[in-house]
């Protein structure tokens, strides 16, 4: 992909303007504007993709934009997934720009390359690419119930599914089993891949799985969780919002439970 393009003043484009991992929003949306309508300098803009036949640009914010107009990407949950992911790409590239500005080999200053999304050392030419941390996320089913957990970091008190970072030398399936047992005391079986989602908080890739209960009683790790429960569809607490892979996993598990009940009733 060409990352630097000549901008046409009359061309409508989406502008992902980033400041401190937050995005510039107009009317709660990523701005779709012509360059001539913009009030800030766009010389450093990089094209990061296309959405609905319009280019999408990443741009670091400058001082002429009011800080009150910047919001976390969570404010965009529920918009079309393709545009949400492009906004995430912009925030991840911004994260790279600000956290990988020195070479990991020789310590020299690194700058953003002109021809790729990488930070290139000005002394030894080593290229550093955006760091992406692999994470698993899993919905566990026990007959007509789903395993849900509450985290202290969720100030709204929502319940979600189990997630965690993959360790070195570990398969994704091993990580699923380990994270579930470490956080809840539950052992699982029939672990199967479901889907994935880039998650720019700050720079993760969420790899989603479904699994079935095998054994054990819930015994939450209170360093990680504030609660863990088995919940039936009719008894769900507040859960992860739409637009998250966690919500997709919850909805899929509830659909599987409903389908199983339907077959049993035939």
UniProtKB/Swiss-Prot annotation:
What Gene Ontology terms describe what this protein does at the molecular function level? magnesium ion binding; manganese ion binding; NAD+ diphosphatase activity; NADH pyrophosphatase activity; RNA NAD-cap (NMN-forming) hydrolase activity; zinc ion binding
CDD domains registered for this protein in UniProt: NUDIX_NADH_pyrophosphatase_Nudt13
Q: Which residues bind a divalent metal cation 3?
A: 179, 183, 224
| Record-annotated Nudix hydrolase domain positions | 130-253
Q: Name one GO biological process term.
A: NADP catabolic process
Binding annotation for a divalent metal cation 1: 163, 183, 224
Residues binding substrate are 74, 129, 197-204, 246
Keywords attached to this Swiss-Prot or TrEMBL record, sorted alphabetically, are:
Hydrolase, Magnesium, Manganese, Metal-binding, NAD, Zinc
The protein, known as: NAD-capped RNA hydrolase NudC
Organism (species): Photobacterium profundum (strain SS9)
The gene for this chain is nudC
């Amino acid at each position: 992909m060409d990352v630097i393009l000549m901008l046409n003043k009359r061309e409508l484009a989406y502008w992902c303007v980033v400041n401190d991992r937050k995005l510039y929003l107009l009317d709660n949306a990523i701005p779709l504007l012509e360059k001539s309508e913009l009030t800030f300098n766009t010389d450093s803009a990089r094209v990061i993709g296309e959405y609905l036949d319009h280019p999408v640009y990443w741009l670091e914010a400058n001082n002429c934009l009011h800080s009150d107009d910047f919001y976390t990407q969570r404010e965009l949950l529920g918009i079309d997934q393709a545009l949400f992911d492009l906004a995430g790409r912009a925030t991840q590239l911004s994260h790279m720009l600000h956290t990988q500005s020195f070479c990991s080999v020789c310590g020299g200053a690194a700058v953003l390359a002109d021809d790729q999304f990488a930070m290139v050392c000005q002394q030894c030419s080593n290229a550093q690419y955006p760091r992406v941390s692999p994470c698993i996320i899993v919905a566990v089913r026990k007959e007509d119930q789903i395993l849900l957990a509450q985290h202290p970091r969720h100030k709204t008190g929502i319940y979600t599914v189990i997630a965690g970072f993959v360790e070195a030398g570990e398969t994704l399936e091993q990580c699923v089993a380990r994270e579930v047992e470490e956080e809840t005391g539950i052992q699982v079986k029939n672990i199967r891949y479901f889907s994935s989602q880039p998650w720019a908080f700050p720079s993760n890739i969420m790899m989603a799985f479904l699994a079935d209960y095998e054994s054990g009683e819930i015994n939450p790790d209170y360093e990680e969780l504030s609660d863990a429960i088995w919940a039936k569809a009719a008894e769900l607490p507040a859960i992860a919002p739409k637009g998250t892979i966690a919500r997709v996993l919850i909805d899929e598990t509830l659909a599987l439970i409903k389908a199983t009940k339907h077959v049993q009733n035939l």
